[in-house]
């Protein structure tokens, strides 16, 4: 999976990420991965569900990976942050 098929979910409105996924799918890509960490995880789930239910009904959720990443802060302290990857595939 190339890096251009990955949509990183952050603090922007949900519809911005939905548009990014729909644009990639309409451009000929058959697979897109949504990646999010921390509080953006719920936004990533929202993006996947909006794309699946409203825009591209024949899209499938191929795989969901969850993990915990260790982030090193400015003071050198380690913080655990939850992360998710949602793999979407269009047949």
Swiss-Prot record:
The keyword Transcription regulation does not apply. Disulfide bonds: none annotated. GO terms for cellular component: chromosome; cytoplasm. The keyword Cytoplasm applies. One of its GO terms (molecular function) is double-stranded DNA binding. It is found in: Cytoplasm; Chromosome. InterPro entries: Alba-like_dom_sf, DNA/RNA-bd_Alba, DNA/RNA-bd_Alba-like. SUPFAM superfamilies: AlbA-like. Keywords: Chromosome, Cytoplasm, DNA condensation, DNA-binding. It comes from the Archaea. It holds the Pfam family Alba. One of its GO terms (biological process) is chromosome condensation. Binds double-stranded DNA tightly but without sequence specificity. Involved in DNA compaction. Belongs to the histone-like Alba family. This is DNA/RNA-binding protein Alba.
């Amino acid at each position: 999976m190339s890096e251009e098929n990955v949509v990183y979910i952050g603090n922007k409105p949900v519809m911005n990420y939905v548009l990014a996924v729909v644009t990639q799918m309409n451009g000929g890509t058959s697979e897109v991965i949504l990646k999010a960490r921390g509080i953006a995880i719920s936004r990533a789930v929202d993006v996947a569900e909006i794309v699946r239910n409203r825009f591209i009904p024949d899209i499938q959720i191929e795989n969901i990976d969850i993990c915990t990443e260790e982030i090193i802060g400015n003071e050198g302290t380690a913080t655990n942050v939850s992360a998710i990857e949602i793999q979407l595939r269009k047949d």
